[in-house]
Every structure is written in structure tokens, then in C-alpha cells.
């Protein structure tokens, strides 16, 4: 089936996810029907345990639906092999988490370039892209600094630079401001939106931060694994 300009980036049809629990199966997501368009900025909100992070993991090919269909453009993500999922993540997805997971013994630019080098990219190319990404997040003056000398907000910005290094089509962020103070979190949240607009990448954010959610173009609210509400400002 050919992709057309109107094809959604993501299409979920009756998507559910369950895990084996003690003595019974634990249902986390219950039959989600949803589309996400290329270039959107989307917040996923809801109480703890509502399925937000599970949904993000499905969108990032970190997990597979138990039932239903999940398509990226016209590709069935549920039918991907583990190798295909890994290639898909490397090519299409950038991940940002609450904790930056930067390696303290390396410089900022080394941390940002490292995964590309491990994947086989020549050092010069990887470092060039890393410097460009760090410039995008306002860290051009901190390139050679050890990450231990960076503030919390700067470390999260370095993690964002790492996520956008290869210009993925989608940026998935799980509580990206959850470990930051209010002012720093606002700076990081607005930076994510700036990158969404400037680079044209789809931004999907799981957050408990109401102010951050309200900045997004659309807010999806999950309750007990179901899509309870969709809201556009």
C-alpha cells in the first residue's frame, strides 16, 4: 500500500497491552484508537499507572501491542522482528527520559556523539553532528566540558542533543522535566517545542507537568488504560 500525503504518522486501531501478573494478566492499555500526524506536538497525560509510559514504549518500538494494530505510516510495527525494531529506533526515533543517563567520565560532545560512533559512524562525522546538535540546544560553549560540571538543566539539554543527533522523525520524551525545578523545566519544555517547529520532527511527551502539556498542540488524557479525552488548546 502506497503512502499518501494524508497518511498519519502513527495509526492505532484497538491497541491493547497486557503483562503477566501474579496469578492473572495485568491489562495496561485497553483498545486505543488514535492517529498522530507528522509534525504534531502531543502531550500524554494521566494519573500514575494509567498507561502513559507503556503507550510511549509502543510508539518507540520498545514493546509490542498484545492486540490491535499499530502502524508507523503504512508499516505494521507489531510485525517487526527484533532486528527491524532496533533499526527502526535508530533511524526514526529519538528518546529523552527523566534522567539523562550521561556518562560522567566523558565530555559533553563525547556523550552526544558516542552512540553514533558505536553504530559505526566515522568519528569526525559523529563529532560534527554532535557539535551541531549541542548548538541547537544552546550548549555550544560547553562542548568540551565534563558533564559533571553541567547544571541539571544543561545535562538534560545535552541529552536532548543526543536524541536529535541523527535528525529522527519522532522525538519521544518521558517526563523530560520531572527532575528539574520549575524554571529550568519551563526552559527545557519550550526548547523541545522549538525543536519540534524548527526541525519538523513529531514531538510526543509524557508529562505530569500541566504547564508543559498546555504548550503542546494536542493533549491526550489516559484513564485506567483508556483514551479518556483529547484536547487542542
UniProtKB/Swiss-Prot annotation:
GO cellular component, one term: plasma membrane
Residues binding ATP: 46-53
Keywords, alphabetical: ATP-binding, Cell inner membrane, Cell membrane, Membrane, Nucleotide-binding, Translocase, Transport
SUPFAM superfamilies linked to this entry: P-loop containing nucleoside triphosphate hydrolases (SSF52540)
EC number annotated for this UniProt entry: 7.6.2.-
Subcellular location, record wording: Cell inner membrane
Membrane topology: Peripheral membrane protein
Pfam families documented for this protein: ABC_tran
Single GO MF descriptor: ATP binding
Domain ABC transporter: 10-233
Biological-process GO terms, alphabetical: lipoprotein localization to outer membrane; protein localization to outer membrane
Primary subcellular site in the record, as a coarse category: membrane
Annotated Gene3D superfamilies: P-loop containing nucleotide triphosphate hydrolases
Function text: Part of the ABC transporter complex LolCDE involved in the translocation of mature outer membrane-directed lipoproteins, from the inner membrane to the periplasmic chaperone, LolA. Responsible for the formation of the LolA-lipoprotein complex in an ATP-dependent manner.
Subunit: The complex is composed of two ATP-binding proteins (LolD) and two transmembrane proteins (LolC and LolE).
Family to which the UniProt record says this protein belongs: Belongs to the ABC transporter superfamily. Lipoprotein translocase (TC 3.A.1.125) family.
Alphabetized PANTHER family for the sequence: IMPORT ATP-BINDING PROTEIN, LIPOPROTEIN-RELEASING SYSTEM ATP-BINDING PROTEIN LOLD
Name of this chain's protein: Lipoprotein-releasing system ATP-binding protein LolD
Organism per entry: Nitratidesulfovibrio vulgaris (strain ATCC 29579 / DSM 644 / CCUG 34227 / NCIMB 8303 / VKM B-1760 / Hildenborough) (Desulfovibrio vulgaris)
Upper taxonomic lineage: Bacteria, Pseudomonadati, Thermodesulfobacteriota, Desulfovibrionia, Desulfovibrionales
Name of encoding gene: lolD
Amino acid at each position: 500500500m502506497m503512502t499518501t500525503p494524508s497518511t498519519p504518522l502513527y495509526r492505532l486501531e484497538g491497541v491493547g497491552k497486557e503483562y503477566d501478573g501474579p496469578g492473572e494478566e495485568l491489562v495496561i492499555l485497553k483498545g486505543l484508537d488514535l492517529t498522530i500526524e507528522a509534525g504534531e506536538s502531543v502531550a500524554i497525560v494521566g494519573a500514575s499507572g494509567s498507561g502513559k509510559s507503556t503507550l510511549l514504549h509502543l510508539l518507540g518500538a520498545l514493546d509490542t501491542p498484545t492486540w490491535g494494530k499499530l502502524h508507523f505510516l503504512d508499516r505494521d510495527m507489531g510485525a517487526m522482528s527484533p532486528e527491524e525494531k532496533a533499526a527502526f529506533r535508530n533511524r526514526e526515533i529519538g528518546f529523552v527520559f527523566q534522567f539523562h543517563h550521561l556518562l560522567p567520565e566523558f565530555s559533553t560532545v563525547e556523550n552526544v556523539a558516542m552512540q553514533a560512533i558505536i553504530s559505526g559512524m566515522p568519528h569526525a562525522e559523529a563529532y560534527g553532528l554532535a557539535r551541531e546538535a549541542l548548538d541547537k540546544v544552546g550548549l555550544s560553549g560547553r562542548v568540551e566540558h565534563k558533564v559533571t560540571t553541567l547544571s541539571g538543566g544543561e545535562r538534560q539539554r545535552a541529552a536532548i542533543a543526543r536524541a536529535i543527533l541523527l535528525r529522527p522523525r519522532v522525538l519521544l520524551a518521558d517526563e523530560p522535566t520531572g527532575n528539574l525545578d520549575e524554571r529550568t523545566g519551563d526552559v527545557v519544555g519550550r526548547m523541545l517545542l522549538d525543536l519540534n517547529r524548527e526541525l519538523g520532527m513529531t514531538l510526543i511527551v509524557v508529562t505530569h507537568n500541566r504547564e508543559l502539556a498546555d504548550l503542546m498542540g494536542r493533549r491526550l488524557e489516559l484513564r485506567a488504560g483508556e483514551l479518556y479525552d483529547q484536547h487542542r488548546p
